[in-house]
Amino acid sequence: MDLTLIPEFKLRLWENIMNLNVKDAASCKYDMISLGEIMLRLDPGEGRIKTARSFRAWEGGGEYNVARGLRRCFGMRTAAVTALADNEVGRLVEDFMLEGGVDTSLIKWVPYDGIGRTVRNGLNFTERGFGIRGALGVSDRGNTAVSKLKPGDIDWEHIFGELGVRWFHTGGIFAALSETTAEVVIEAVKTAKKYGTIVSYDLNYRPSLWKDIGGKEKAQEVNKKIAKYVDVMIGNEEDFTACLGFEVEGNDANLKKLNIDGYCKMLSEVVKVYPNFKAI
């Protein structure tokens, strides 16, 4: 392993992190806002989804969980930008959000047609693992209100320019929901940067979300456009490979022997291609 690569890489990232000019709290209504889908999570406890007769309900979403965690753990002023069908399920999700202390004023409420033909709310069944049995997640999120968001639906000028936001977080799950959600991300990050808001993005590659809309090729097309506006990029080596096209050299096919130098070199290449990344 070439140890000379690690100090150089760490130094470059540390210098960039120190240059994260987060806006003054007094000038902003929110410390952080998220953009993404928030689903009703149904948990069968110790049981199996396919045999359960009762579920415990929660709310959750890859991007939203960051806002909730910052509010509950650190008392930060957070809000979630999302869309929900205006029915009892949507209002239940809102109630969970309120319980978590997250501001719900930025939710876009979409009229419900009574059966979900035009719009609905997402469900996520989550089964915990036990022993050698792996955990299982089953998402029912097609045709959801948030997947229908398109550029112009959210007043980003008002959010970033008038209300003020110190940190904006979104990710690859939301970007993969539809052609238009990717466009909404780009619209949002451009406006965030215009007003000096720090942008973080979780690549969070999910093959199931991309496979029917172009797979890795589409994921890279979308994420490369977004990456140009990101300050803090989050992901593992699989995310950087699938979403941004970088490769780790020297690993065997089964990943039984890992080439640490290869990971360092890949990350060094990442910061060369995207000098705007201040932290990875």
Regions found by a protein language model. Give the residues of each.
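Short pre-catalytic strand/loop immediately N-terminal to key active-site residues, enriched for Gly-Thr
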Residues: T51-G60
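Alpha-helix C-terminal capping segments
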Residues: W58, N65-R77, E99
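Hydrophobic beta-strand scaffold residues
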Residues: T78, T104, V199-Y201, I234
